[in-house]
Amino acid sequence: LNQFIASSPLPIMLLNENEKNINIADFGSGSQEIFFQLSLMDIKKKINIDSIEVEALVNFFEKKKFNNKQVKINFLKKFNFKKKYDYVHISDSLQYVYDWENFLKKINANDHKYIIINNVPAGKNKTYITKQKFYGKEIPNIFFSSDKICKCLNNFKLTYKSLFLNKINGVYRSYPQDNFNKRDR
């Protein structure tokens, strides 16, 4: 590929959205990038974001003032699988979900409009777990078979995939994997 995406496609997708009220589940929303991007856009829609994050971040963000006129945000510690969303946005986080197959199958069971899986380490390899050095700690990290992800989300159709270059130490590049077999990269 001669192109890469540096952030989520969700804000651009909303430009062609016809609905006046849009519900978004933002799983692994981290620093609330989606909220801030949408808040800066001239969108004539009401957007409600359920931001699903770990408890420490939810507790931190609940103390802040995030809402603006068009975009409202709720902070949740667990994904609401019973709620129907227009957009389910999973970015930079699926690789840390231990029971990821069950998680995706529960999402698949609902009638969401779109599911966006952004910055997930996936390819034509088998799914495997390794360790990642993360702020001085080693944590489990899953590398996915893209075919297996598609099987878990069989009520949806894969419409686009691209190489994602992540910003690592200030430089956009692919994940360093020289220590893995070539078939697993």
Regions from the PLM with identified roles:
Residues 22, 86, 113:
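Conserved acidic residues
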Residues 96-110:
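A short, conserved alpha-helix within the catalytic core of class I
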Residues 1-23, 32, 135-136, 145-146, ...:
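N-terminal accessory regions of S-adenosyl-L-methionine
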